[in-house]
């Protein structure tokens, strides 16, 4: 079990597992990539409690977020809060379709790529094993 705390003097939210991420400390990797993976694997099934946390946090003046895992978040916290709201409400970040295909002669591959649209991202991906 974990507990979230807020320190008023320094405006620090100690967020427990919320806003955590995988990865090594001191690397310049973008926060969303490993934070998304962390959310899916660690926090994902607790969407409703995260939504409650976000609603309570909206009433606080937060300057810093200190998760149990990952970097301390400072500066403009809006992108982090927005992504956590999206993830915890189980909404897609972008509209899209993933098409998994296997194509011996290339015809299925060609058909998989025909569904592109300006409003929806289509991501065809071959699942054939690479030749050794």
Annotate each language-model stretch with its function.
Residues 1-75:
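Metallo-beta-lactamase
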Residues 76-132:
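N-terminal beta1-alpha1-beta2 submodule of the flavodoxin-like/Rossmannoid cofactor-binding fold
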């Amino acid at each position: 079990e974990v507990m979230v705390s807020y320190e008023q003097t320094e405006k620090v939210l100690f967020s427990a597992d919320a806003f955590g991420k995988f990865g090594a400390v001191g690397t310049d990797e973008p926060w969303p990539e490993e934070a998304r993976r962390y959310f899916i694997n660690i926090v994902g099934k607790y969407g409703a409690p995260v939504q409650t946390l976000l609603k309570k946090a909206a009433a606080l003046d937060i300057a810093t977020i200190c998760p149990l895992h990952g970097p301390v978040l400072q500066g403009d916290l809006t992108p982090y809060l927005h992504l956590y709201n999206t993830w915890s409400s189980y909404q897609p970040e972008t509209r899209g379709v993933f098409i998994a295909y296997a194509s011996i002669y290339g015809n299925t591959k060609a058909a998989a790529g025909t569904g592109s649209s300006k409003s929806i991202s289509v991501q065809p991906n071959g699942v054939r094993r690479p030749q050794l």
